[in-house]
Amino acid sequence: MNQNIDPILRADLQRVAEVFPHWEELRNKSVFITGATGLVGSMLVRALCAAPVEVSVIAHVRNEQKARAMFGDLPVSYCVGDVTAPVEYDGAVDFILHTASVTASKSFVTEPVQTLTTAIDGTRN
């Protein structure tokens, strides 16, 4: 596990690894995570990388350099792209976790339709 994270977060991730009851269902599976550098997505990436079973994690990100800095030496594959455009990924994917979202509060007020469209198009793509 990446050691450059807060000790409390590290302890929480270890606890998830110990108590999550469905690890066997994820053994040797691949999980594609949109919004992987966001709050929810990054926690899912870290939790899956801390799993006591082999899980292939594919992080869909807009900025690979930012993602690599965030995840350090964690065993993550990267798919670079924008969630509002069709995803170009040729590998096998067993599960998709769509966590990408517009998070700027101002956007909800100034661009409400685009905010919702981003979430909807991300699901379609």
Please describe what each predicted stretch is.
Residues V80-T118:
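NAD(P)H-binding glycine-rich loop region in Rossmannoid oxidoreductase-like domains
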Residues V53-A67:
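Conserved glycine-rich Rossmann-like NAD(P)H-binding loop of the short-chain dehydrogenase/reductase
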Residues F32, I58-H60, C79, L116:
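Conserved Rossmann-like nucleotide-binding pocket used by diverse enzymes
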Residues S30-A50:
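N-terminal Rossmann NAD(P)H-binding glycine-rich loop of SDR-like oxidoreductase domains
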Residues F95, G122-N125:
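Conserved cofactor-binding/catalytic machinery of classical short-chain dehydrogenase/reductase
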Residues M1-V31:
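Non-catalytic terminal and boundary segments that flank Rossmann-like NAD(P)-dependent oxidoreductase
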